[in-house]
């Protein structure tokens, strides 16, 4: 955590601390403080890093029990470093929603990270550089640690969507209800299919999906009854987003029956 403690004291860390994630779903008249109160640490750009660090530790602990040959001790160390550093460059390029981020956006973020690394962290960069190249900016999709970290990030998105779903079910955040529905719809459209695929080789992912099975199923059912949620997208995207959600829902139903 020393890496994070040093970074959060920089101007870059302070910039992240003042920003929220999932901003596109937040009603404009709702404060950042209220948004964080509802959805927790994942919503603040800086504390998202330590939350992801915690998710990485959870994955590592579960893998040590269920899949002890999956990760070496060095793998475990690099995953935790990657969690703490992966969004540092967003202090410069900003946060882009998962479904909107393009390959060009990824390249710009990587370039900003590399150009400013010495300012982000003044210390030994050996582990940071290794995590950066092998995990954070691994674009091959074939590297084991890159896949594990991608799965951890996707679990983070789903976790926050399920927290939003809790507020929908309880009806205790009506000032944000439409935005929470949209957040849940967007995440359910994008994350479950990939996580189902990861569950075939990464047992901690399979356990997470099993533990959250009923809640995920309920949120799919709620969004399936809320067709107007897709009106939040630009008109030229709405039909594609409906289809994407439908395909994801179908994949989840098939997974439930497997």
Language-model-derived ranges and their functions:
Residues 1-258:
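Alpha-helical, largely C-terminal catalytic domains
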